[in-house]
Each structure stands twice: as C-alpha cells, then as structure tokens.
C-alpha cells in the first residue's frame, strides 16, 4: 500500500492562534503504534479547549487536534499484535497510557498520570494520517459506516461510561443537562437503550424537537423555565435518580445537585472553564447525594459503547462537512449553535 509523505491537515502553532489547513508531513508509527488513514473525525468541545489552551493542562505545540478519528490501518510498528493492514480502527481521546501504574492495572487507563492524549499531547485526527497506540486504538467492525461511528469513539464512550457511573436501574429517571448537543444527543439514546426514563435540559432553537426525536420523554428549556429545579422534581416525582452533566455551565451543575433525589448520583462530565462544583453540605449529607466525576472510558467501555451502535440502538445525529471548514465549526461551538455532532471528511 502506497503511503504519501505529505497530507492535508489542520494545525495551529500557538494556542488561540490561526488554524491552518495545509500540507503537513505524514507521521511514522512507532514500534507500538498503528498508522491510520483517517477518513472521518468527529469534532468535540474538547478540541475547542485544546486550541484555546484554556485548560490547566498544557498542549503540545504545534498541534493537530481531533480525537474521534475513524479510518483504516495502513501501517504498523514491529511490536503490534492483534491488528492487520486493512482493519478499521478508531482513534480515541486516550491515545496511549503506561500500562504499568496502579490506575492502568485497575483498567482506569484514562487516569494514568502519563496518559498520552489524542489532539492534545499527541497529534490527533484532524489530518488524513494519524498514529495511535495499538493497545488503545478501537477495533471497529468491518462494514461499519465510518462517518457515523466517529462520534462514538469519544462522545459515545464518555456518556455511556457516565451512565454506568450513575449506577441506576431500569425505570429510573436520568436528567441530562445539555441534552441536545453532541454528547447529550448520544446520552439520550444510550439512556433509553439501558432502560432509563429520560428528562432533558437544554435551550435554543430545534433542541426540544431533536431531543424528542431521539426518544426523550420530558424536555425543559432553560431559556423559558422560571424554576428548573421545581420542574424537574415535579416531572420525575421526587427528583432524578441520576444526573449527567454534559453542558459547560457552572450554574447548571449547581442546579443539578438540587434536583437530584435522595441517594441519587450527580455525574460531572462537561468541563466549563474555571468552574467550581458548589454544593450545600447540609443538603448533600441529609439527602445522601453522590457527586462524582466521569472521564471518558476504558477499553471495555469502548467495546460496549460500539456494540450498542453496531446493533442500531444509538445513532449519532451528525452533519458531515469538509476538514477545511473546521474554523467555522469552532465559531458555531463558541456561539452554542451546534445541534448534534459535526463530523469532518478529511478528503475535503
């Protein structure tokens, strides 16, 4: 298979600086890595943070962003096992980890202190060819629609793991804050497939319609509601058993603790800049509310999340555009005008 020496990609040289769609070198895989011809990549809010550099974690520079890449294995290092040329592979947020620390031993690889992150500390999937650690790369079944599966590799895995973390049972109410965005639209579907009743909170044109089309039961528009907490408690007959916070609003997180029912779990997923999680201690203790963070997922979570997708139980509402339009996508993200998930075609 002929592999070019240069490729199209989007790269920036300083955080918040210009995004260049240009010819860049094709990387060479290390002994433990795959070289993947990326066909499509989802665009995540994390990519926006990586570009801006507004998280308390330094990015590499220059940087090619992206961490929801779906493509074909075209080369591999000498130490790679379990893969062959032509396999479909996914590039995840967790590109690689040490596999030797306590967290890796417990299958919490995303919490590895030496984790290598796609599109952050490792050049990611906003290019036509990208490398990924063979252990962490996702096995995508043959025949899978690569554009459709791309968002599952981060957004899908992340919300699926968050729902597991909430430890609910079938028939319980889950409230999803940010229910019509890229993460939320998948969370609604995974929640339905897992047997939960779904209440969504979001605001803006078309969001209730999207939420209901995905199987959501009760929708609250925060731009119109005068009492979100009261409305959630009333609709769920006492409060949500679990809350999945995927919005990037500190106020939404604070409210979610108030409408979570006794012995329920509030799961923090979205990462608003400089946000604090504020909870009234008396209320939290007396109601025995759990507040936990959930950070992407491990290899088993990835396999399970992909299985839901391959069985037709979840379907990312995507809009496919060319990689060259990435700056415009970031602008829409900043304005909160994204419904579902943007996916970029690396050939355009």
From Swiss-Prot:
One GO cellular component term: cytoplasm
Catalytic activity line of the entry: a primary alcohol + NAD(+) = an aldehyde + NADH + H(+); a secondary alcohol + NAD(+) = a ketone + NADH + H(+)
GO molecular function per UniProt: alcohol dehydrogenase (NAD+) activity; zinc ion binding
Positions annotated to bind NAD(+): 178-184, 202, 207, 269-271, 341
Pfam families per record: ADH_N, ADH_zinc_N
Alphabetical list of SMART domains matching this protein: PKS_ER
Cofactor(s), names only, from the UniProt record: Zn(2+)
Modification type N-acetylserine: residues: 2
Subcellular location field: Cytoplasm
Keywords attached to this entry: Acetylation, Cytoplasm, Metal-binding, NAD, Oxidoreductase, Zinc
Residues that, per the record, bind Zn(2+) 2: 98, 101, 104, 112
Tagged with keyword Metal-binding: yes
EC number: 1.1.1.1
InterPro entries per the UniProt record, alphabetical: ADH-like_C (IPR013149), ADH-like_N (IPR013154), ADH_Zn_CS (IPR002328), GroES-like_sf (IPR011032), NAD(P)-bd_dom_sf (IPR036291), PKS_ER (IPR020843)
Binding site for Zn(2+) 1: 44, 67, 154
Gene3D superfamilies listed in its UniProt record: Medium-chain alcohol dehydrogenases, catalytic domain, NAD(P)-binding Rossmann-like Domain
Subunit comment: Homotetramer.
UniProt name for this protein: Alcohol dehydrogenase 2
Gene: ADH2
